[in-house]
């Protein structure tokens, strides 16, 4: 049965990852968290004191990095592994968030991650979220979504997410971090964050995760019908 690629882009803390995970499960597709991949690289750079402005050091570091996703049968979630170690919790911490935009802006890092992402999705049937999936990684994706939300709502969501991970962070600090990431993501030279011309924009400010998923699910089914793909098992 033919399957499509669903590319979900947008700003941080708009609900991309949560929505993408649920959508993938409903479609029976593979979920690929590209944000976790860049966070893993950032974590490695922090742990090994890699100078991100030194091309030789960056290249050597990338050759030592192996990222994989492993399904946790107990939690029914996909967890991120860096060089064989589960880093799912560590990469979500604030100190990594403060580094990830800087690291992800490095051309060689993006090139290496994009190659890995394209390899992971070569058989299609994936839901992938990030910053440049629909514009750079898979410009030919059958369905492209671009998610936005109010800044303060995004900050509150991120604060709640961190609280659930037992991290108490002031809301103003989170707003500053998000504003900084937005600026770096939209102004970097290599694959900046932008909405693809054929992407559906969804404002998640006032809608629930369930409503987000239902909205994209309806668009996905409509797209598959348009392409005359089999949707009996969805």
Curated annotation (Swiss-Prot):
One Gene Ontology molecular-function label: CMP kinase activity
Record-linked InterPro entries: Cytidylate_kin, Cytidylate_kinase_dom, P-loop_NTPase
Keyword Transferase in record: yes
Catalytic activities: CMP + ATP = CDP + ADP; dCMP + ATP = dCDP + ADP
Keywords, alphabetical: ATP-binding, Cytoplasm, Kinase, Nucleotide-binding, Transferase
Pfam families assigned to the protein according to its UniProt record, in alphabetical order: Cytidylate_kin
Main location: cytoplasm
UniProt entry tagged with the keyword Mitochondrion: no
Family listed: Belongs to the cytidylate kinase family. Type 1 subfamily.
HAMAP family to which the protein is assigned, alphabetical: Cytidyl_kinase_type1
Protein name: Cytidylate kinase
């Amino acid at each position: 049965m033919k399957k499509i690629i669903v590319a979900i882009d947008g700003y941080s803390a708009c609900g991309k990852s949560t929505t993408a995970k649920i959508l993938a499960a409903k479609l029976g597709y593979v979920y690929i968290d590209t944000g976790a991949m860049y966070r893993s690289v950032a974590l490695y750079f922090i742990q090994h004191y890699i100078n991100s402005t030194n091309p030789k050091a960056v290249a050597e570091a990338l050759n030592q990095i192996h990222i994989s996703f492993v399904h946790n049968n107990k939690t029914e979630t996909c967890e991120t592994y860096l060089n064989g170690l589960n880093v799912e919790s560590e990469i979500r911490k604030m100190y990594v968030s403060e580094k990830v935009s800087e690291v992800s802006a490095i051309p060689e890092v993006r090139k290496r991650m994009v190659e890995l992402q394209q390899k992971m999705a070569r058989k299609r049937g994936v839901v992938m979220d990030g910053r440049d999936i629909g514009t750079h990684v898979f410009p030919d994706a059958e369905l492209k979504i671009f998610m936005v939300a109010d800044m303060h709502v995004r900050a509150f969501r991120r604060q709640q997410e961190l609280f659930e991970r037992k991290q108490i962070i002031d809301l103003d600090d989170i707003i500053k971090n998000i504003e900084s990431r937005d600026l770096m993501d939209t102004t970097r030279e290599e694959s900046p964050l932008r909405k693809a011309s054929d992407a559906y924009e969804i404002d998640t400010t006032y809608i629930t995760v369930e409503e987000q998923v239902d909205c994209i699910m309806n668009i996905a089914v409509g797209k598959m019908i348009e392409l005359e793909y089999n949707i009996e098992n969805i």
